[in-house]
Each structure stands twice: as C-alpha cells, then as structure tokens.
C-alpha cells in the first residue's frame, strides 16, 4: 500500500525579491484577513507594499531568505526514513522516477514493501499546493495523510493549509482516501522532547540564578480567539503537560506571545513584556518557542537578535526548535501510523 504524507507548513521567501509576493499571499488569505474581494485584494497589496522594506531587513540578517524550506526538507527526510525504516522485504530495488524539488524520494526499497513518501507543501511560497498535488498524483498513492507542522490547531494556520490542499487536490483529481492530522499539541513524544530540552538549558541557567521559563508562542488577534479558535487553549495545555513532565519543584514559568502586528488587540502577555519583567526581577531566562517546530525569522531574528538584547549577557538561554529531534520525528511518525 503506497502512502503519501504531505507536510503542511507556512513557507517563507527564498530570496529578497520574493518578500513582497510572499507577504501578499499571506495577507490575501481569507483566513488571515476576512474581507470580501476586491477589498481583501487591495488591502493585501497595500500591506505587503508597506511592510516589504522592514521584512527585507529582517531576512537580510539571516542570509537573504527564510530557512524554513531547508529545515522542513530535513524533517521530511527524517520522517520518511522513520516511516520506512523497518521495511526490508527483498534486496531488489524499485525506481521511483526523477527527483522532484518538492518531495524527497526513498531510494531502493524492496519490491513487496509498503512504501511511504513524504512531500512538502507550503502555504504562502513555493512549493505551493498546486505544484505538490501534481507530484502526489504522479506517485499515485492509495492514501494521502495531511500532516500540518503546526502543533496547536488554528483556523489561521492549520485550517487554511488544509483547505488550500483540498481545493487543489480536487482540481487536479486526487481521489484516493485522505486522512487529516489536525494537531499534536498533547502528543507524549512532542511533550517529552520539549521537557528534555528545557531540562538541559535549565541546568545551564541555574548556574547564574533561579531561572524563569518562558513559553513563547506566536500571537493571534483576540478577535480570532473569540470566534472559537482553540489555539490559545491548546498552547496552554501543551505548557501544562510540559511543566508536569519536568518535575521541577517551584518552577517559575509563564506563557507569552510574540510576533504581533497591527493595531488590534492580540493575545497577551507579550514575550517582550515578560522579558522586561524578568530583567527587572534579575532572573535568568530559559525561553522555549512552543508553537514553532523549525527555525525562521520569528526565532532567528525576533528571539535571537531583538529580544536577546533585553536580558543581561549570560542570562538568556533560548532553546532551539525541535527541527529533526528524534522524539519529534517519532511523534510525527506515530501520528501517521495511528491515522492509517
């Protein structure tokens, strides 16, 4: 039985010239700005033009592009290996055809083996859904598994990506059974992976004082939450499970939210305000980006460059995103297997 796992993620500009069209695609999404056309179109044009220069400066600091695609490719490779790891049926090999830009082929697997191939589909920049569905259709799987790389479900991320895939899959005639994994905020391996990383950095931070652990999640407008979006509740549940797993007596911790844009009210407290509070209290900070599973501008620039300057030298311990952490890959593989 052939299975296609499609990793759904945000995407990011692959060059400075891609910054404005990337921003336009983001703000033109009806799940981001819920206005009818042509109003949404013209507003997306206006916002992307207005924000382009600042966004370009951000990406200039990290090599002129977003690293999210490269990071997601590594995750796809690791997941594909894990899903096919124990399948060895015959020493003969099967040819899978030419390598495609937006999927990672498995080389030489037994003719009678179950084959799973992992594809990458980005929402706002290449590889787009209309590109990836062609590769999936050519692969001709018996089953498609949609796996968003957003731990906590939100209509602005998870649902947007799923709807976009479904629209293109229907257009290109993908008719096989499709299963959807909507979140993994409470997955045991996901929780344990974070707990292990916190423990390591907490010990380092303890050398200069009693640390405060900040769980930093991408913020959302309160208007989205008030409509029933479960994102904030799932962030809180993720953190509660991690704190419980840590078994650290009298742990000082807080949830905070980053990357707010625009004048409307967003989830609070902000990561910046919590860092300022930690500075005033004179405590070292262990910061975990809880809603990100790969590095991009919000972690590499916002957390590592801008916010780091708030805290005294030697008092800031930023935990890396899970990326290809073995427990995280195990988490993703388990989600695929249990949904099969």
UniProtKB/Swiss-Prot annotation:
Record-listed E.C. numbers: 4.98.1.1
Presence of the UniProt keyword Secreted in the record: no
First-level EC class: lyase
Subcellular location: Cytoplasm
GO biological process: heme biosynthetic process
PROSITE patterns, per the entry: FERROCHELATASE (PS00534)
Catalysed reactions listed for this entry: heme b + 2 H(+) = protoporphyrin IX + Fe(2+)
Domain of life of the organism encoding this protein: Bacteria
Keyword Iron applies: yes
Pathway: Porphyrin-containing compound metabolism; protoheme biosynthesis; protoheme from protoporphyrin-IX: step 1/1
Keywords: Cytoplasm, Heme biosynthesis, Iron, Lyase, Metal-binding, Porphyrin biosynthesis
GO cellular component: cytoplasm
Xref: InterPro entries: Ferrochelatase (IPR001015), Ferrochelatase_AS (IPR019772), Ferrochelatase_C (IPR033644), Ferrochelatase_N (IPR033659)
Residues the entry annotates as binding Fe cation: 218, 298
MF terms in GO: ferrochelatase activity; metal ion binding
Pfam families per the UniProt record, alphabetical: Ferrochelatase
Function statement: Catalyzes the ferrous insertion into protoporphyrin IX.
Official protein name in the record: Ferrochelatase
Species whose genome carries this gene: Wolbachia sp. subsp. Brugia malayi (strain TRS)
Taxonomic path: Bacteria, Pseudomonadati, Pseudomonadota, Alphaproteobacteria, Rickettsiales
